[in-house]
Swiss-Prot record:
Tissue and organ distribution: Expressed by the skin glands.
Function in brief: This peptide both inhibits the activity of the angiotensin-converting enzyme and enhances the action of bradykinin by inhibiting the peptidases that inactivate it. It acts as an indirect hypotensive agent.
Transmembrane stretches, start-end: none
Keywords carried by this UniProt record: Hypotensive agent, Pyrrolidone carboxylic acid, Secreted, Toxin
UniProt name for this protein: Bradykinin-potentiating peptide Phypo Xa
GO cellular component: extracellular region
């Protein structure tokens, strides 16, 4: 399974 890494804003 491909799990995309999202950039979470601070």
């Amino acid at each position: 399974q491909f799990r995309p890494s999202y950039q979470i804003p601070p």
